[in-house]
A protein has these predicted regions:
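Extracellular glycan-modifying ectodomains
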Residues: 1-267
Length: 267
């Protein structure tokens, strides 16, 4: 998909970031029998990329910080801290300046019990909740969500929501969860524009892009309700200079996601 898209938008740079999951770094040995190294899988996927597509080595940056709170225990996502290290790896790949994490104003929401509890109903998980750490954009930002590619039906959106009380919904802190299409505008002044193509791992990553890009577009191909989306045309019409695919390692085997994405890219 990335190779196909890159061939259609030669004036834009295309990057692919595959995010490892918690299991790669913290999974008990007895549960890893028969599972393949995600690092090896990521490397194999990147070898299939054409020269005009850059694979982002988020894995190594995340691996350097495994003593930090990079993944939730009760949920299948990475934390904002884990997403930051992936963002740092992207900046290095793209030749962009990455702001140190301690330069962002931060906060947290306590008592988050996520998807792993929902699947298992484990009392042990319930008794040991996570917290959701967030990092606020350093610049003035605004955001809207849309259901059409021409972006005529905008609804206001919060980039970071700091007041979510439902214990199972606190990952919605980041861009209010999964929307078909989002446009975010930052006063960072770079003049750069990026399209982030993602599933839910990208939600925690998206706010950091506002530190580097004046406009950040976020597309979730799983939300097939979006009308009229042709990604090459969208990139051209909006003057987007950078496209970043951010997905966790299992997404390439998700046929629904890949079919929707390929339809939006076109043959």
């Amino acid at each position: 998909s990335a190779n196909n898209l890159a061939s259609k938008i030669p004036s834009s740079k295309v990057y692919v970031m595959l995010a490892p999951t918690r299991l790669e770094f913290y999974g008990p040995e007895e549960y890893r029998t028969g599972s393949h190294s995600q690092q090896m899988g990521i490397s194999t996927a990147y070898l299939a990329l054409n020269p005009e597509v850059t694979g982002v080595d988020a894995y190594s940056e995340i691996a350097r910080h495994t003593d930090e709170y990079e993944y939730f225990r009760t949920d299948h996502h990475w934390t904002a801290r884990g997403a930051y290290y992936a963002y740092k790896a992207f900046c290095e790949s793209a030749g962009l300046t990455c702001t140190p994490l301690d330069s962002f104003q931060s906060g947290k929401l306590d008592d988050f019990v996520g998807s792993m509890y929902r699947y298992t109903q484990s009392e042990n998980l319930k008794k040991n909740p996570d917290y959701v750490e967030y990092f606020l954009p350093r610049y003035d930002v605004s955001a809207e969500s849309f259901s059409t590619a021409d972006m005529t039906d905008g609804k206001p959106l919060r980039v970071i929501s700091t007041n979510i009380t439902d214990e199972s919904s606190k990952y919605l802190t980041f861009i209010q969860g999964d929307k078909p299409l989002i446009k975010m505008v930052s006063s960072c002044g770079s003049g750069k524009k990026v399209l982030l193509i993602k599933e839910s791992y990208g939600n925690a990553l998206a706010p950091f892009l506002l530190d580097t890009f004046s406009e950040v577009y976020v597309l979730d191909p799983r939300q097939e309700s979006i009308q009229g989306m042709n990604i090459p045309s969208f990139v051209e019409n909006n003057g987007i200079d950078t496209v970043l695919f951010c997905n966790y390692t299992m997404v390439p085997s998700n046929s629904k996601y890949m079919n929707a994405l390929n339809t939006m890219i076109g043959a």
